[in-house]
Swiss-Prot record:
Functional note: O-methyltransferase that catalyzes the 2 O-methylation steps in the ubiquinone biosynthetic pathway.
Alphabetized PANTHER family for the sequence: METHYLTRANSFERASE (PTHR43464), UBIQUINONE BIOSYNTHESIS O-METHYLTRANSFERASE, MITOCHONDRIAL (PTHR43464:SF19)
Annotated NCBIfam families: UbiG
Protein name: Ubiquinone biosynthesis O-methyltransferase
Any one GO BP annotation for this protein: methylation
Pfam families: Methyltransf_23
Transcription as UniProt keyword: no
Organism: Brucella canis (strain ATCC 23365 / NCTC 10854 / RM-666)
Amino acid sequence: MTETARTTIDASEIEHFSRIAAQWWDPQGKFRPLHKFNPTRLAYIKEKVCAKFNRDPNAPRPLEGLRFLDIGCGGGLLCEPMARLGATVIGADASATNIEVAKIHAAQSSLDIDYRATTAEALADAGEKFDVVLNMEVVEHVSDVDLFMSATSAMVKPGGLMFVATINRTLKAYGLAIIGAEYVLRWLPRGTHQYEKLVRPEELEAAFSKADLRLIDKLGVTYNPLADSWNRSRDMDVNYMVLAERPA
């Protein structure tokens, strides 16, 4: 009798995002919060990658020659700016519908991005390695966090980086990111996040340690309703980002 293979795929999550995939590139649509959040995370990624790999952030293509993986890439909101900055980008998502949307938009934008409808564990099993792994707003949607973090961590080259952005598992996050954002303000479709699947920073740190990655930075990201913008913060109670590296 064969053992059932472990997977990080949550079928209900894939169905949810596939259903609204056509709206990925509508800045006023279902993914408006990600469009608003994007400048903050892009600036952080560019700053840290340029510092790590001794690149001039003011150069037109400072990420030239670096291999990026955006896991759970959705419609490509991070893949496209990374490609414009010169990175060689693989965008992977378990939703084939998301990948089709991403491919069409990249073609319309004349960008060469390698989009694949696949999983983190399949890529890791194939021996894929990257200078930078972007694990952004996805860990809270997988069925097996330990397996997902193990698979994504395994793909970080020696000297490489992994960025993780997610939502903390706190009562404050439940009130703001779920009740507030999904039920009161309706920024996101109801059911986008489940409280029990949210991940605490210390849980990510434990996963990094197990995978021989070293945590090098962590910060909160908070929303300013007056400016309708997201900003870096010391407050990690709701949205936060962490950065880890694999020693060279």
